[in-house]
Curated annotation (Swiss-Prot):
Cofactor note: Binds 1 zinc ion per subunit.
GO molecular function, a single term: rRNA binding
The organism's taxonomic lineage, starting at the top: Bacteria, Pseudomonadati, Campylobacterota, Epsilonproteobacteria, Nautiliales
Protein name: Small ribosomal subunit protein uS14
UniProt cofactor(s): Zn(2+)
Length: 61
């Protein structure tokens, strides 16, 4: 329940712009969110492996 309330709180516009932070649009995770996709690293990897993100491929070197 605490996580849901924090997600709802993050959606509101903060009083000061500095207080705004990124959250994963799928799971609500705060840390390691990629701005380009708007999702966290865990969801990014899961979606990339399933082929749901166009243009993303596994790196090999």
């Amino acid at each position: 329940m605490a996580k849901k309330s924090m997600i709802a709180k993050a959606k509101r516009k903060p009083k000061f712009k500095v207080r705004a932070y990124t959250r994963c649009s799928i799971c609500g995770r705060v840390h390691s969110v990629y701005r380009d996709f708007g999702i966290c690293r865990i969801c990014l990897r899961k979606m990339a492996n399933e082929g749901l993100l166009p243009g993303v491929k596994k790196a090999s070197w």
